[in-house]
Structures are given as structure tokens and as C-alpha cells.
Amino acid sequence: MKRDERWEGVYSFEDSPFIMEILTELRDESTGPIAFRKGLVKLGRYMAYEITKTMATEKVPIRTPLEETEGIIVKDRRNVVIITVLRAAIPLMEGLIKVFEHARVGIVSASRGKAPKFEIEMKYVKVPRIKAEDTVIIADPMIATGSTLIKVLDEVKKYGNAKRYVVVGVLAAPEGITRIKEAHPDVEMFVAAIDRELNDHGYILPGLGDAGDRAFGEPIRFEDGAPGGI
């Protein structure tokens, strides 16, 4: 894990060969939905392990079968709220919760409109009460323009003031990171890799395509109303 010097509190895992191997499989257009979902779960899990290194720890007395000694617990691991941005973040959240098994979970449905406005529509928000000792982790695989996460952070912060706000993603574009840090300077960001740029349609380059579609299949879009005149 390394800090990106362009921003405060932004970290990538481009120095981790294992995480880069998982990311390579996710980028490959020949990777099918099953392997893609499994890759997102693995990334969530291993990135969660790394995030625990930034959390407060506490020494505790314990007794082994042979003698008394001292152990360590990751104290902050017990005060985590994971916010899942539907639908692409579901496998990523599954990996995170394997490490943060005490976490309370919130669900947000937010979708980004088409270029050039990229307007964000939020249709569903279920967030638990946030406490002062909490670390709030927002899982969203693709951090492109940053518009979705800015809107989600605006909403989540209404539910209480947390100790930390952390974004976990697979890929991020520099444009999106800059916008998020300008809107929410207190937010830390952990991503597998920071890619080159966005294209005119708001997709990350070189990227990996639409994470939701690749994980769950491309949805049917009825441009002229519901099927069969329903």
C-alpha cells in the first residue's frame, strides 16, 4: 500500500503483486461474470486486511494454555459501518465484511446519468445510525467522475458524525479523486489502482468496463416503456 503524493489521504495497492494479479484478471475482457465476482470479493477482502493496518489497536492480557501473556486487538475493527453502492459494490462488500464481520451495513442505490451532465439519481437509502467512534467504509468499485460518491457522502453524513470516512474502490480516475477530495477533504480513499483518465463518456481508461454489467450481466433497458405494453 502506498500513498499517492498528489492528494492527502489517497492510497493505492499498485505495489502489491497479488492485488495487481487480481486486477489483471478483472481488466481482461475475456473474464466471465463468475470469475469477475470472485475477483471483486478477493479484492475487498485483501484491501480490508490492509486497511486494518491504519486502525487503532489495543494491547490485551490473555492466558494461553501455558502462561499469561499479552495480545493485540484491532479496536476500530469492531466499530465499522459499510455502505454498499448498488449494484456493482455487492461483491466488494462481501469481501470487506469477511474482515469487518462486526460491521453494520447500509445500502444506497445511486445511478449516474449520461454525458455530458452525469446527473446522479438516488432511489433507495437505508443507512444505520452512525456513531462518533465509527469508521464508515463506502464501497464503490469504479470511481470515475466522483459524482456518485459525492452525492452518497453528502447523504451518509446526515446519519451522524463518524471518526473516519473511507472510500474503497477498485479503480479511480484522477478527475474523480480530485472532485471528491475538494467536496469532502476529510475522506480517505483506498483503491487497487489509479488509472490514466476518463473518456468522453465518463469511463475510466484503461479501466475494466462497467463493473456492474460484468459482474451481474447487462440489464435490459426499455427505452420506449415496459415490454408487452405493461
UniProtKB/Swiss-Prot annotation:
Gene Ontology BP term (one): uracil salvage
Family membership: Belongs to the UPRTase family.
GO cellular component: cytoplasm; ribose phosphate diphosphokinase complex
EC class name: transferase
Coiled coil: none
GO molecular function: GTP binding; magnesium ion binding; ribose phosphate diphosphokinase activity; uracil phosphoribosyltransferase activity
Tagged with keyword Magnesium: yes
EC number: 2.4.2.9
The keyword DNA repair appears for this protein: no
Residues reported in the UniProt entry to bind GTP: K38, G39, L40, V41, K42
Protein name per Swiss-Prot or TrEMBL: Uracil phosphoribosyltransferase
The record's free-text note on cofactor binding: Binds 1 Mg(2+) ion per subunit. The magnesium is bound as Mg-PRPP.
Residues annotated for 5-phospho-alpha-D-ribose 1-diphosphate binding in this entry: R87, R112, D140, P141, M142, I143, A144, T145, G146, S147, T148, D210
Cofactor(s) the protein needs: Mg(2+)
Gene3D superfamilies reported in the protein's UniProt record: 3.40.50.2020
Regulation: Allosterically activated by GTP.
Reactions catalysed: UMP + diphosphate = 5-phospho-alpha-D-ribose 1-diphosphate + uracil
UniProt KW keywords: Allosteric enzyme, Glycosyltransferase, GTP-binding, Magnesium, Nucleotide-binding, Transferase
Cited Pfam families: UPRTase
This protein's pathway: Pyrimidine metabolism; UMP biosynthesis via salvage pathway; UMP from uracil: step 1/1
Stated role: Catalyzes the conversion of uracil and 5-phospho-alpha-D-ribose 1-diphosphate (PRPP) to UMP and diphosphate.
Superkingdom as given in the UniProt entry: Archaea
